[in-house]
Amino acid sequence: MRRPLLAGNWKMHYGVSEGVALVEALSADLTDLTDRDVLVCPPFTLLGSLAPLLDGTAVALGAQNMHYEAKGAYTGEIAPQMLKELGCSYVILGHSERRQYFGETDALINRKAHAALANGLKPIVCVGEVKAERDSGQAESVVVGQLRGSLAGLSAEQLRGVVIAYEPVWAIGTGDTATPADAQAMHARIRAELAALSDQATADAVIIQYGGSVKPDNVDELMAQPDIDGALVGGASLKAADFIRIVRFK
């Protein structure tokens, strides 16, 4: 049985005081979870401040990006082991905003995925199509191509340590959401591709999140789909009440 993973991606929001207030509200409320996992991914600048507050709580800590090298002359970058030392257990890789604004490729994301796993971090590998690709009937081929490139060279055992996040780019921050049926269809296609890359048992073990304007009023229907195993939440994760309601989906 796959345990749902509800992750909040704060993106480039919040300073220390706002971040502390948010995680204190989350950790105070989310004390009785037994069948799902919760994660927040704040900006790098907050990791050191929030890690001690989350230690021993039900809320795990993750980062929004990392470099694939262990150290070196990479100005502005963060190494996997640095994240581990700060208490991170997850790292988001290949978010569509990284692909769009910073030119990240499947090959680069693949190097990062290998490095994350080698350093004991669980990568959340993001895939998703833009609106033109969906409208032209290319959504599945685009997503499958991203999966193959981003996960190349990973063993079945390694794949079991990866989380996939399907985020249709046209739905991120727009208020538009894929219908539960459309989201389920893509998640099922992703799981079928994971089976082709490894085996069915491995594919059945991998958590596949949905992301893209997940809100309190649509999370229940999304999470009722058989291949949707959680959510990667953007804007709604910045408000404690909204994110708590999402975590407590029914």
Curated annotation (Swiss-Prot):
GO terms for biological process: gluconeogenesis; glyceraldehyde-3-phosphate biosynthetic process; glycerol catabolic process; glycolytic process. Pathway: Carbohydrate biosynthesis; gluconeogenesis; Carbohydrate degradation; glycolysis; D-glyceraldehyde 3-phosphate from glycerone phosphate: step 1/1. The active site is at residues 95, 167. It is found in: Cytoplasm. Its main location: cytoplasm. Keywords: Cytoplasm, Gluconeogenesis, Glycolysis, Isomerase. Its EC number is 5.3.1.1. It is an enzyme of class 5 (isomerase). Substrate binds at residues 9-11, 173, 213, 234-235. GO terms for cellular component: cytosol. It catalyses: D-glyceraldehyde 3-phosphate = dihydroxyacetone phosphate. Pfam families: TIM. InterPro entries: Aldolase_TIM, TIM_sf, TrioseP_Isoase_bac/euk, Triosephosphate_isomerase, Triosephosphate_isomerase_AS. GO terms for molecular function: triose-phosphate isomerase activity. Involved in the gluconeogenesis. Catalyzes stereospecifically the conversion of dihydroxyacetone phosphate (DHAP) to D-glyceraldehyde-3-phosphate (G3P). Homodimer. HAMAP family: TIM_B. NCBIfam families: tim. Belongs to the triosephosphate isomerase family. This is Triosephosphate isomerase. It comes from Herpetosiphon aurantiacus (strain ATCC 23779 / DSM 785 / 114-95).
